[in-house]
From Swiss-Prot:
Organism: Yaba monkey tumor virus (strain VR587)
Domain Helicase C-terminal: 326-505
Originating gene: VETFS
EC number, as in UniProt: 3.6.4.-
Gene3D superfamilies associated with the record: P-loop containing nucleotide triphosphate hydrolases
Function noted in UniProt: Acts with RNA polymerase to initiate transcription from early gene promoters. A DNA-dependent ATPase activity is associated with VETF.
GO molecular function: ATP binding; DNA binding; helicase activity; hydrolase activity
Motif (DEXH box): 135-138
Subunit field text: Heterodimer of a 70 kDa and a 82 kDa subunit.
Name this polypeptide is given: Early transcription factor 70 kDa subunit
Record's keyword terms, sorted: Activator, ATP-binding, Helicase, Hydrolase, Nucleotide-binding, Transcription, Transcription regulation, Virion
InterPro entries in the record: DNA/RNA_helicase_DEAH_CS, Helicase/UvrB_N, Helicase_ATP-bd, Helicase_C-like, P-loop_NTPase
């Protein structure tokens, strides 16, 4: 990161269309490392810091010299990248060749390069002299995409830009895959990793630390958004190590079936079953693997006060909630909370069934669906919920547009957004005031990713109000342990604890090692001080102009203040004046604090900001913005 660029923007205004200082500073580093030196880079920027825009700005710069291939996890994130590309282009006041940029989902890229599940090696020559940008890079390994990337890297000797807010998903092994893609070193991972009996006992040894430092030195960009730009996070519940957890004590009914299932699930292979009964017990549903079979039952009794018929749950148990200590706490708590709520859960089939009918039975209506019993209202309209799963790929974008809209700032359109793992990455949620974990996440990465959907820059109009986080753990009726240290229990003792508590402790063990490695990556992150790289000088100057004319509506054409600002990048006064003349005659777009959206014009001996707005006739049949010439028809 070029700190000299950051220093150009003291008092930077972030509330207008802009490129943030750290984004420009990182862009400078990427140009020097990837384009000039042909090195691969890991962009390890914590969630919410604008990795996508940095990557797309870099793609636009690189498109002048090479073809750029961008890989994203799925079709919904592809839509986000396409939208963000329009944002990046609007901020990009320099030349680019859009035809040299190709954005693919991993599935479409797979189809493009495989024939009958075999890599089409002859077709890989198209990637010679290219650059690859991979979003959520930690997720591509262990599948065909990871295999293909390794083949392309070895065959074409091209650089990669890997984007990740959490490069370790579960264990250091994930990071080892990233290292192999970024370098030409042949690493025996048995030499750098200590392998224990449990997953959380996989550690990086001293040799591994040295390998990490030696290979990744000069290949890491680390950045974390200052917390001053974010709302305070208020964790609720009982103190648990360095966080807080809400203990949800089971009823006798839940504890009985919970224990029965646990006896059958004595190792991590059956974690799904334990996640289910930790969320809620449903009698026979807990003991079969194919839920679809039971969903076809007619009036099947699960408990005396709970039945299932054609996949529909009904009965008083959905309101007394002896089947779920978590939902008993949740339903009781939300009546006193205001604002939008985001709720994470796993096992979408089982969890989605429970959520839907508990919410309906307790007066909450389904968005664009069934109305709740005795509906609870907000502003005279039913309080609604939506459940997001991987099956919603086509409609997710529309749903999130409603959830994030200004009209829904108070949750009056959609108040409760329940989501499975599909929402753990790349999406942005706005104005969420309450975040719930109905399932304990599997990894530190997943936990941070879920929080990062909401707690991010520009997601809150008022950052003085806190965001509440509720991490719920199902526990036995008599369990009330204070857990203050990872040394409180032996491994044998941990196995006897409530499943959620055991999972939390495992998570914290893994988090300890993850944080150790992240600290190493942070320390070897590249920072330097140099004038902006020639390829991005226009972008830096453009941001200086945007910031200057936010504060100034009218100035003299030979304003010393403006000339001095430009000379920070173009020291030669003639070049500085020439640049000012070009941006004024080109009617550069700015956002002014008085006139808002404006264009720069010369009026006599002054530079003025002229406000504008786009308008159209009342009845417009069509405007095709993809054509060079547009024809607008109206009555």
């Amino acid at each position: 990161m070029n700190l000299e660029i950051v220093d150009l923007f003291n008092g930077h205004v972030n509330s207008i269309p802009n490129i943030l200082p750290h984004q420009l500073a990182t862009l400078d580093y990427l140009v020097r490392s990837i384009i000039d030196e042909n090195k691969s880079v890991l962009l390890f920027h914590i969630m919410g810091s604008g990795k996508t825009i940095i990557a797309l700005l870099f793609a636009l710069v690189a498109s002048r010299f090479k073809k750029v291939y961008i890989l994203v996890p799925n079709i919904n994130i592809l839509k986000i990248f396409n939208y963000s590309m329009d944002v990046a282009i609007n901020l990009f006041n320099s030349e680019y060749i859009l035809e040299n940029i190709f954005i693919h989902s991993t599935t479409s890229f797979y189809s493009l390069n495989y024939n009958d599940n075999v890599i089409n090696y002859n077709g890989l020559s198209r990637y010679n002299n290219a650059i690859f940008i991979i979003d959520e890079a930690h997720n591509i390994f262990g599948n065909n995409t990871g295999e293909l990337m390794t083949v392309i890297k070895n065959k074409n000797k091209i650089p990669f830009l890997l984007l990740s807010g959490s490069p370790i998903t579960n264990t250091p092994i994930t990071l080892s895959n990233i290292i192999s893609l970024m370098s030409d070193e042949n690493i025996n991972f048995g030499d750098i990793i200590i392998q224990g009996k449990k997953v959380f006992q996989i550690l990086l040894n001293e040799n591994g630390v040295n390998v990490l430092k030696n290979i990744l030195k000069g290949r890491i960009s680390y950045y974390e958004m200052p917390s001053t730009d974010l709302p305070k996070v208020q964790y609720h519940g009982k103190k648990f190590l360095d966080t807080r957890v809400v203990y949800c004590h089971m009823s006798k009914l839940q504890e009985k079936d919970y224990n029965n299932v646990r006896k059958l699930c004595n190792n991590e292979m059956f974690e799904k079953n334990m996640n289910n009964v930790s969320l809620a017990v449903l009698g026979q549903l807990n003991f079969i693997n194919n839920l679809d079979i039971l969903f076809q039952e007619q009036d099947k009794e699960l408990y005396p006060n709970l039945k299932i018929s054609n996949g529909i749950l009904y009965g008083d148990e959905l309101t007394t909630l002896n089947i779920s200590s978590k939902f008993k706490y949740f339903i009781g708590k939300i009546t006193s909370l205001t604002g939008k709520q985001f709720i994470y859960f796993s096992n979408s089939t089982y969890g989605g069934l429970i959520i839907k009918y508990i919410m309906l039975s307790n007066g909450y209506s389904e968005y664009n669906g069934s109305q709740g019993t005795n509906p609870k209202l907000i502003n005279g309209k039913p309080k609604t919920f939506a459940i997001v799963t991987s099956k919603m790929k086509s409609s997710l974008e529309d749903l999130l547009n409603v959830y994030n809209s200004q009209l829904n700032k108070d949750g009056s359109q959609i108040m409760f957004l329940f989501s499975s793992n599909i929402m753990s990455e790349s999406y942005t949620l706005k104005e969420v005031r309450n975040i719930w974990f109905m399932t304990i996440p599997d990894t530190f990465s997943q936990y941070n990713q879920i929080l990062g959907r909401s707690i991010r820059k520009f997601s809150y109009f008022d950052i003085s109000k806190p965001v509440n986080v509720y991490l719920l753990a199902t526990v036995y009726a008599d369990f009330d342990d204070d857990i203050t240290s990872l040394e409180d229990y032996s491994l044998d003792e941990i196995n006897t604890l409530p499943f959620d508590i055991k999972k939390l402790l495992y998570l914290k063990f893994k988090t300890k090692e993850t944080n150790r490695i992240y600290s190493i990556l942070q320390n070897i992150s590249d920072t330097y001080r140099m004038p902006p790289h020639p390829y991005i000088v226009e972008l830096v100057l453009g941001e200086i102009v945007r910031q200057f004319f936010y504060h100034h509506s009218r100035i003299s054409f030979d304003s010393k203040e403006l000339i001095n600002a430009i000379q920070l990048v173009l020291p030669n006064i003639d070049m500085a004046k020439k640049y000012i003349n070009e941006v004024v005659n080109g009617h550069f777009f700015v956002s002014n604090k008085v006139f808002d959206k404006s264009l720069l014009y010369r009026y006599k001996n002054d530079i003025i900001t002229v406000p504008f707005k786009l308008s159209h006739e009342r009845f417009v049949w069509g405007v095709n913005f993809r054509k060079e010439y547009n024809v607008v028809s109206s009555p």
